[in-house]
From Swiss-Prot:
<keyword id="KW-0963">Cytoplasm</keyword>
<dbReference type="InterPro" id="IPR018163">
    <property type="entry name" value="Thr/Ala-tRNA-synth_IIc_edit"/>
</dbReference>
<dbReference type="Pfam" id="PF00587">
    <property type="entry name" value="tRNA-synt_2b"/>
</dbReference>
<dbReference type="InterPro" id="IPR012947">
    <property type="entry name" value="tRNA_SAD"/>
</dbReference>
<comment type="subunit">
    <text>Homodimer.</text>
</comment>
<feature type="domain" description="TGS">
    <location>
        <begin position="1"/>
        <end position="63"/>
    </location>
</feature>
<dbReference type="InterPro" id="IPR012676">
    <property type="entry name" value="TGS-like"/>
</dbReference>
<dbReference type="InterPro" id="IPR004154">
    <property type="entry name" value="Anticodon-bd"/>
</dbReference>
<keyword id="KW-0862">Zinc</keyword>
<keyword id="KW-0694">RNA-binding</keyword>
<dbReference type="GO" id="GO:0006435">
    <property type="term" value="P:threonyl-tRNA aminoacylation"/>
</dbReference>
<comment type="similarity">
    <text>Belongs to the class-II aminoacyl-tRNA synthetase family.</text>
</comment>
<dbReference type="InterPro" id="IPR004095">
    <property type="entry name" value="TGS"/>
</dbReference>
<dbReference type="InterPro" id="IPR047246">
    <property type="entry name" value="ThrRS_anticodon"/>
</dbReference>
<dbReference type="InterPro" id="IPR036621">
    <property type="entry name" value="Anticodon-bd_dom_sf"/>
</dbReference>
<feature type="binding site">
    <location>
        <position position="387"/>
    </location>
    <ligand>
        <name>Zn(2+)</name>
    </ligand>
</feature>
<feature type="binding site">
    <location>
        <position position="513"/>
    </location>
    <ligand>
        <name>Zn(2+)</name>
    </ligand>
</feature>
């Protein structure tokens, strides 16, 4: 038998006279590497450390220092959850346990909901199992035998999952954690010693196949890392994120609430709506300064329009419907078809293009209830939506201009770490490959002109076109996807949008879909968490509170409030019969940027004592001097 040559990342080669496992190659290099080996990447494909290499191949040893290694640790921790749960609660049924961002979860069918006490017991059992330092054994098993294994164990959900698999899959990996067995593509860790840096984080409900009509499952979430240092850093980040939770701050500052009777829909309170209006007016100015005409389109449209647009075939599961007089209408999930209708009212010359429309468009999408999360993931939301109807030759200039607008907006709201990505054609899409090639090339060209680097995301574009995505990093290092710019060669033709070219021929324009903040609800939720409720003064729902020390200053306090309000500031007066120290503490906790304290001396001198929310005493100044200070701060 010819020798098998293994090529390592540094270009060095090792030869073996028989099929060799990843672990054996690692052992041939050194005992330290072998001990650290989690898996391997053979010719670009991740495999288990026990898998045999039977031909010449390139090999990269995967350890906990690699991103792939950490992901494998997380996946194996999900299996360890299964092992612990089945020992503690033998009657439950295991469903599925995937890796997610920074962690993992396992869905489990249980007759009763798990409690926090259950989660603590499961975590303790997992730690006990890890301490046993046992090997995780992989066995590639014929499909029929896999069915038999899970049938004997009464794991009906595993059997359903196997039933869903293609007939081409004739064998699969079974991973044994002692007496517990799970099926998976793998790879997994070779031993439980790699799983020490984990923590279970929460329990929630989920539905089989994500459908609320199906039975409810228990979902156990956890996180896992390469070592305790990384785990501790993550826990600190999560504790900080918990302090910044927009739901907690929203309640504490009386900004908004949600309730069961309206899942995924927001009740805005006066201060929250004030914050909304500041954001909206800022974005309205962006529309005006960028040459967008603001429009307003209907909330519901006959389904025939959604059939023409392509939403019916590609998006109807996420749409709400209603009926009237034997006609079916859809509540709009997107604003684009409405903007095409505005464009279609009248004849356009190529000289008129580009034509830009903007709308603070209220949309509704039928998100699964389990996916809803505060105001970050809702069913009813408003977008700073815009559409540009242009010539192909104008795409680059429009995308470049949008890029500059978007960066300026993000900077103004306090974000300066921005990553740019291009989401490419999805499997389910409109149009042919040539059209998609053209659209994707246009976005690459425009970003090239902007001189920025970007990452490409295959399969993540919208069904009607590729898109540029703007991903913003917040104050604690989390990344949020916000703005988008999409090139669409399809929808104008489907909805009859036309212009007359220089040869008097009717042509379909290119349609650019753009949003900078995206969902206003989500953006405000992100702002709350990014600033931890301590908004910059220009953005704060209440910029100034004027507080008296005794009733003798009440009239003067009210006159100061009116003076500030007349200058356009968002100001309130605190005339309660409370000690001034109490008032200061309360408004500081409310993150109000400025507190103006008024006693007899300030009243006599027509002045105010100025304090910031950080506790800094700026001293006594005239009301006009304070106004100048606040105006200068807002203009900065």
């Amino acid at each position: 038998m010819p020798m098998i040559t293994i090529t390592l990342p540094d270009g060095s080669r090792r030869e073996f006279d028989a099929p060799v496992s990843v672990m054996q190659v690692a052992q041939s290099i050194g005992a330290g590497l072998a001990k650290a080996t989690i898996a391997g990447q053979v010719d670009g494909q991740l495999v288990d450390a026990s898998d045999l290499i039977e031909h010449d191949a390139s090999l990269r040893i995967i350890t906990a220092k690699d991103a792939e290694g950490v992901e494998i640790i997380r996946h194996s921790c999900a299996h360890l959850v299964g092992h612990a749960v089945k020992q503690l609660y033998p009657d439950v049924k295991m469903v599925i346990g995937p890796v997610i961002a920074e962690g993992f979860y396992y869905d489990i069918y249980s007759e009763r909901p798990f409690t926090p006490e259950d989660m603590a017991a499961i975590e303790q059992r997992m730690q006990q199992l890890i301490a046993q330092d046992y090997d995780v054994i992989k066995k590639v098993t014929p499909r029929a035998e896999v069915i038999e294994v899970f049938a004997q164990r009464g794991e009906e959900y595993k059997l359903r999952l196997i039933e869903d698999m293609s007939d081409d899959i004739t064998a699969m990996g079974l991973y044994y954690h002692q007496e517990y067995v799970d099926m998976c593509r793998g790879p997994h860790v070779p031993n439980t010693r790699f799983l020490k840096a984990f923590k279970l984080t929460r329990i929630s409900g989920a539905y089989w196949r994500g459908d609320a009509k199906n039975e409810q499952l228990q979902r156990i979430y956890g996180t896992a890392w390469a070592d305790k240092k990384q785990l501790d850093a993550y826990i600190l980040r999560m504790e900080e994120a918990d302090k910044r939770d927009h739901r907690k701050i929203g309640k504490a500052q009386d900004l908004f609430h949600l309730q069961e009777e309206a899942p995924g829909l927001v009740f805005w309170h006066p201060k929250g709506w004030s914050l909304w209006q500041v954001v909206e007016q800022y974005m309205r100015k962006v529309y005006r300064d960028s040459g967008y005409g603001e429009v307003r389109c209907p909330q519901i449209l006959d389904v025939s329009l959604w059939q023409k647009s392509g939403h019916w075939d590609n998006y109807q599961d996420a749409m709400f419907f209603t009926e009237s007089e034997k006609r079916t209408y859809a509540v709009k999930p997107m604003n684009c078809p409405g903007h095409v209708q505005v464009f279609n009212q009248g004849l356009h010359s190529y000289r008129d293009l580009p034509i830009r429309y903007g709308e603070f468009g209220a949309c509704h999408r039928n998100e699964p209830s389990g996916a809803l999360h505060g105001i970050l993931r809702v069913r009813g939301f408003t977008q700073d939506d815009g559409h540009v109807f242009c010539l192909e030759s104008q795409i680059e200039a429009e995308v470049t201009a949008f890029h500059q607008q978007a960066l300026a907006v993000y900077t103004a709201f306090g974000f300066d770490d921005i990553q740019i990505k291009i989401a490419l054609r999805p499997e389910k899409r409109l149009g042919d490959d040539a059209t998609w090639d053209k659209a994707e090339a246009a976005l690459r060209s425009a970003l090239g002109v902007c001189g920025v680097e970007w990452q490409e995301l295959p399969g993540e574009g919208a069904f009607y076109g590729p898109k540029i995505e703007y991903h913003l990093k917040d104050a604690i290092g989390r990344t949020w996807q916000l703005g988008t710019m999409q090139v669409d060669f399809m929808m104008p033709g489907r909805l009859g949008a036309e212009y007359v070219d220089e040869h008097s021929q009717k042509k379909h324009p290119v349609m650019l879909h753009r949003a900078i903040v995206g969902s206003m609800e989500r953006f405000i939720g992100i702002l709350i968490e990014h600033h931890a409720g301590a908004f910059p003064a220009w953005l704060a729902p209440v910029q100034v509170v004027v507080a008296n020390i005794t009733d003798a200053q009440a009239e003067y306090v009210d006159s100061v409030r009116k003076t500030l309000a007349n200058q356009g500031f968002r100001v309130s007066a605190d005339l309660r019969n409370e000690k001034i120290g109490y008032k200061i503490r309360e408004h500081t906790l409310q993150r109000v940027p400025y507190l103006l304290v008024v006693g007899d001396r300030e009243k006599e001198n027509g002045a105010v004592a100025v304090r910031t929310r950080s506790g800094e005493d700026l001293g006594t100044m005239t009301v006009s001097a304070f106004i100048e200070r606040l105006q200068a701060e807002q203009a900065a």
